Amino acid sequence: MKKSDFHYELPEELIAQAPLAERAASRLLVVPPAPAAFGDRQVRDLPELLQPGDLLIFNDTRVIPARLFGQKASGGRVEILIERLLGEREARVQIGASKSPKAGSVIALDAGGQAEVLGRDGEFYLLRFQIPTPLEHWLLEAGRLPLPPYIRREPGVEDRERYQTVFAREVGAVAAPTAGLHFDEPLLARLRERGVEFGHVTLHVGAGTFQPVRVDKLDQHVMHKEWLNVGATLVEQVRRTRARGGRVIAVGTTVVRSLESAWRKTEAAPEGELQPFAGETQIFILPGYRIRSVDAMVTNFHLPESTLMMMVCAFAGRERIFAAYHHAIAQRYRFFSYGDAMLLWGGESGVGNGES
């Protein structure tokens, strides 16, 4: 399988550069299993599309202002993107500079303080910060929000709120789980009234999510690592949902990645079952992989040739996904992080397109 198998052409003007005024006003392309027709709805219509007893699972990670700027002793400019916090004063980071900094070198930070390069960690660097407060708190004032590179503007005050989900609580991501950006408190209240239950996982989206696939043969691709936590409470919620005939709906690819990473074969469940898990995942989901943990997913539109595009093709089928993307482009949907969303149903869900 090749990277080029997941390419599509997208008019640049369809890349959303800013969020809509209302989160739930985003459009929602409902994609039932073939041959049912697609449905053009809005995210605020989700209560009509789900059933009492269904379980929506969100990623509760919170984005940190992870971008910093500084200067080497030589005078060369440096851009730092924090990939993961490693305690109160250390972090794993990406560094952009004309020449790679050496271990022991010190970067003077524009926001004040210094960062010492401890060494390499694969494609990343390890930094120790000399700052007055723990890094997590210091970044709230000193860091800049790391908007994706396809958003061609500087982050503004509005992004501090809008590039964060309303249920974000576990600090550690450098990019938002963007499917969750569409949910606001009024929509969550209407879903509760409908009888839909909520669960949460944590997956700290890392800087690797911005990196393109650099090889054409996908069996040569090395997937980036991310830390996640699927707790016992969520596992029990899923078990109860299945027992009563409800459906499990992931809000975002990060939730699918979390649940599939926590899927384990046991003697009692030879096909596998969800189990509590906390740790790193490097799972790479592409066509040929069977996603077992969810019946549906809410997800944004993904970049051509990205691992996220490959994941949704694994879930709904490549032909079906490409047909949906062509429909979305023709209907002028907005793409990527601040864009519109899809509701993808798996092949055995038995649902329609939500059109009356």
From Swiss-Prot:
<dbReference type="GO" id="GO:0051075">
    <property type="term" value="F:S-adenosylmethionine:tRNA ribosyltransferase-isomerase activity"/>
</dbReference>
<comment type="similarity">
    <text>Belongs to the QueA family.</text>
</comment>
<dbReference type="InterPro" id="IPR042119">
    <property type="entry name" value="QueA_dom2"/>
</dbReference>
<dbReference type="Pfam" id="PF02547">
    <property type="entry name" value="Queuosine_synth"/>
</dbReference>
<keyword id="KW-0949">S-adenosyl-L-methionine</keyword>
<keyword id="KW-0963">Cytoplasm</keyword>
<dbReference type="InterPro" id="IPR042118">
    <property type="entry name" value="QueA_dom1"/>
</dbReference>
<comment type="pathway">
    <text>tRNA modification; tRNA-queuosine biosynthesis.</text>
</comment>
<keyword id="KW-0808">Transferase</keyword>
<protein>
    <recommendedName>
        <fullName>S-adenosylmethionine:tRNA ribosyltransferase-isomerase</fullName>
        <ecNumber>2.4.99.17</ecNumber>
    </recommendedName>
</protein>
<comment type="function">
    <text>Transfers and isomerizes the ribose moiety from AdoMet to the 7-aminomethyl group of 7-deazaguanine (preQ1-tRNA) to give epoxyqueuosine (oQ-tRNA).</text>
</comment>
<dbReference type="GO" id="GO:0005737">
    <property type="term" value="C:cytoplasm"/>
</dbReference>
<dbReference type="GO" id="GO:0002099">
    <property type="term" value="P:tRNA wobble guanine modification"/>
</dbReference>
<dbReference type="InterPro" id="IPR036100">
    <property type="entry name" value="QueA_sf"/>
</dbReference>
<dbReference type="InterPro" id="IPR003699">
    <property type="entry name" value="QueA"/>
</dbReference>
<dbReference type="GO" id="GO:0008616">
    <property type="term" value="P:queuosine biosynthetic process"/>
</dbReference>
<keyword id="KW-0671">Queuosine biosynthesis</keyword>
<comment type="subunit">
    <text>Monomer.</text>
</comment>
